[in-house]
UniProtKB/Swiss-Prot annotation:
Belongs to the RecF family. Pfam families: SMC_N (PF02463). One of its GO terms (cellular component) is cytoplasm. Its main location: cytoplasm. ATP binds at G30, P31, N32, G33, Q34, G35, K36, T37. It comes from the Bacteria. This is DNA replication and repair protein RecF. It comes from Thermobifida fusca (strain YX). The RecF protein is involved in DNA metabolism; it is required for DNA replication and normal SOS inducibility. RecF binds preferentially to single-stranded, linear DNA. It also seems to bind ATP. Keywords: ATP-binding, Cytoplasm, DNA damage, DNA repair, DNA replication, DNA-binding, Nucleotide-binding, SOS response. The gene is recF. PROSITE patterns: RECF_1, RECF_2.
C-alpha cells in the first residue's frame, strides 16, 4: 500500500498543504522546526488516530483555527480509498471515507498501515511501561481494528471502577472489605472478562514478535547477542504460558480478590492490563538500565521492524515513516537500517540535512521551509 496524495488544512504549522506522493522513497529535507515531522505525523494519525508526539489532539490544530483536517488517498490492492479526518479538540472527531458522511472514526481504522521510526522510540526501551503497552496495543489495532473497541471498553470499565474505589477510600470503607460496595463485584467481573481478552491478544502478539525482533536486532548489529521479550502480568508473579481466555479470566478474578484490600485503601485499580509491562532483555539482563545508547536504539528499531514484518505478513507492506532517525545512528547502523527498509513499497524520510540520509535511500526529494513543501526537480 502507499499514500498517493496528502492534503492538510490548519494542521500544526500548515494553513494549507497538498502533496503528491508515489511508491518508493520520498525524503523531506529542512531545518528543525520547519514542519517536516508534522507531515509524517499526519500520515501516522490517519493510520492510528493518535500522535506519537502528544497525548491529546489540541496541539494538532493550527493556532487560531477551530479544527484541523487531514485528507489522504490510500492505494491498496489497486483500489484507492479517500480518507478525511476532521480533528475537533473538545468535541468528537469526524471521519469520511470516499466522501461518505456516514462514516465513524473506527470505520477508517485498518485501511492505512504505518510503521513509524522516531527519536521518541528510545522510550520503548528506556521509558515507562505505558510506552511499551502503547506499542503493543497500536500494533494489535493495526492488525485487527476491533481491538480499538476492546481497549475503549476496558478503559471505560477501569474509569468506573477507579471512581468507585476512590469513593470507597474517601469513606474509609477498606476495613469492611468492600462488603458495602456490591457494585464492585460487578466491575471486577467486567474488568476480568474484557481484560482477559486484551491480555490474551497481547500475549499472542509478543510470541509472534519475539523471533522477528531477535532476527532484526541481529541484522542491525551484526552480533549474536540474544534478546527476549517477556510479558509481565500484574495479576501474577509467574510468567504466563497460556492465551486461553477462560484461564486468564480466572487469573484476573483471583488477583482482583487478593488486591481488594489495598485497592480500597488506595482508591485505585492495581491489577489488570493497564499495569502490565513488556520486559525487554538483552544478554539475560534487563535492557532498561543495562543497554548502552547504541544497543537501546538497535533494540527499539528491532521492535519497530518486527511490527513491520508482522503487518507485511498479513498481506500488505505498511508505509514506513522515518522521522529524523538517521541523525541518531552511527554510520554502520544507518547503512543496515537503510538496507532493511528500502524493500518496503513506500518509505517517507525526514532529515535536517541531505547528508543524514543514506545513499541507499535515494528517491523523490522535497524541501520543507516555513510551513511550505516543494518538490525538488
Amino acid at each position: 500500500m502507499h499514500v498517493s496524495h496528502l492534503q492538510l488544512a490548519d494542521y500544526r504549522s500548515y494553513e494549507a498543504a497538498y502533496l503528491e506522493l508515489e511508491p518508493g522513497v520520498s525524503t523531506f529535507i529542512g531545518p528543525n522546526g520547519q514542519g517536516k515531522t508534522n507531515l509524517v505525523e499526519a500520515i501516522g494519525y490517519v493510520a492510528t488516530h493518535s500522535s506519537h508526539r502528544v497525548a491529546h489532539d489540541a496541539p494538532l490544530v493550527r493556532r487560531g483555527a477551530q479544527r484541523a483536517v487531514i485528507r489522504a488517498a490510500v492505494v491498496r490492492h489497486g483500489q484507492t480509498a479517500l480518507i478525511e479526518l476532521e480533528i475537533n479538540p473538545g468535541r468528537a472527531n469526524r471521519a469520511r471515507l470516499n466522501r461518505s458522511p456516514n462514516t465513524r472514526m473506527r470505520d477508517v481504522l485498518g485501511i492505512l498501515h504505518t510503521v513509524l521510526f522516531a527519536p521518541e522510540d528510545l522510550a520503548l526501551v528506556k521509558g515507562d511501561p505505558g510506552e511499551r503497552r502503547r506499542f503493543l496495543d497500536e500494533l494489535l489495532t493495526a492488525r485487527a481494528p476491533r481491538y480499538a473497541g476492546v481497549r475503549s471498553d476496558y478503559e471505560r470499565v477501569l474509569k468506573q471502577r477507579n471512581a468507585l474505589l476512590k469513593s470507597a477510600a474517601a469513606q474509609n470503607l477498606h476495613h469492611r472489605g468492600g462488603r458495602d460496595l456490591p457494585t464492585l463485584d460487578v466491575w471486577d467481573e467486567h474488568l476480568a472478562q474484557i481484560g482477559a481478552e486484551l491480555l490474551a491478544a497481547r500475549l499472542a502478539l509478543v510470541a509472534e514478535l519475539q523471533p522477528l525482533a531477535a532476527k532484526a536486532y541481529g541484522e542491525l548489529t551484526a552480533t549474536q547477542d540474544p534478546i527476549s521479550l517477556r510479558y509481565r502480568c500484574s495479576a501474577t508473579d509467574e510468567e504466563l504460558d497460556t492465551t486461553n481466555r477462560p484461564q486468564l479470566v480466572e487469573i484476573l478474578r483471583a488477583a482482583l480478590l487478593r488486591a481488594r484490600p489495598d485497592e480500597l485503601r488506595r482508591g485505585v485499580s492495581l491489577v489488570g492490563p493497564h499495569r502490565d509491562d513488556l520486559q525487554l532483555w538483552l544478554n539475560d539482563l534487563p535492557a532498561k538500565g543495562y543497554a548502552s545508547q547504541g544497543e537501546s536504539w538497535s533494540y527499539a528499531l528491532a521492535l519497530r521492524l518486527a511490527g513491520f514484518e508482522l503487518l507485511r505478513a498479513d498481506g500488505d507492506d505498511p508505509v514506513l515513516l522515518l522521522d529524523d532517525v538517521f541523525a541518531e545512528l552511527d554510520a554502520e547502523r544507518r547503512r543496515r537500517l537503510a538496507s532493511y527498509v528500502r524493500t518496503a513499497e513506500q518509505v517517507l524520510v525526514t532529515a535536517a540535512v541531505p547528508d543524514d540520509v543514506p545513499q541507499e535511500l535515494s528517491g523523490a526529494r522535497f524541501r520543507v521551509t516555513g510551513g511550505s513543501v516543494e518538490r525538488e526537480r
